């Protein structure tokens, strides 16, 4: 909402109450929230499911969801999807209006990248059919030279904005 952003930019917080959502806030990192149907989806690390150790869990970001109850409390954190989360980093993400398509950032797997100490980011997409997310597809699979990350759909859902370090920009990463 532009009014809320304007108020924040002008230092006017009196009409807003900041509530610590202790149901999901931890000593680890939680960020990049977005509304998805009746849930809040976000990126977090420090969770141990699928990880061999706590130190490994602290190192990787995955996608999580929590339900928003009738009093706007966040309840019951779960991984967003076993298909969308991998052994690499995931997030941030964006959904279409219908909640049937997601775009998200993931470390891409470039042959030999680990040996070269180079790991790029890619944008992946997945569609939800009959309640099940499809296997994610890399949008820019033919390009392993540059990173593509932080996707955001416009409100009409017909334009995808993202950040990249490909040539032709004005800095390291540009929209």
Give residue spans per PLM region:
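Short, conserved micro-motifs composed of acidic
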Residues: 1-175
């Amino acid at each position: 909402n532009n009014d809320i952003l304007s108020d924040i930019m002008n230092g006017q917080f009196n009409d807003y109450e900041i509530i610590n959502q202790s149901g999901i806030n931890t000593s680890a990192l939680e960020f990049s929230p977005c509304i998805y149907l009746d849930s809040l989806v976000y990126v977090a690390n420090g969770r141990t499911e699928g990880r061999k150790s706590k130190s490994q869990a602290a190192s990787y970001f995955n996608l999580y969801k929590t339900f928003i109850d009738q009093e706007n409390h966040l309840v019951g954190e779960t991984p967003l999807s076993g298909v969308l989360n991998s052994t690499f980093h995931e997030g941030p993400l964006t959904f279409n209006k219908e909640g049937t398509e997601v775009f998200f950032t993931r470390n891409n797997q470039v042959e030999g990248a680990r040996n070269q100490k180079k790991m790029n980011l890619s944008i992946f997409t997945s569609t939800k059919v009959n309640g099940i997310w499809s296997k994610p597809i890399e949008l820019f699979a033919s390009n392993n030279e540059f990173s593509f990350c932080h996707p955001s759909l416009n409100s009409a859902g017909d334009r995808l904005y993202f950040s990249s370090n490909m040539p032709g920009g004005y800095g390291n990463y540009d929209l």
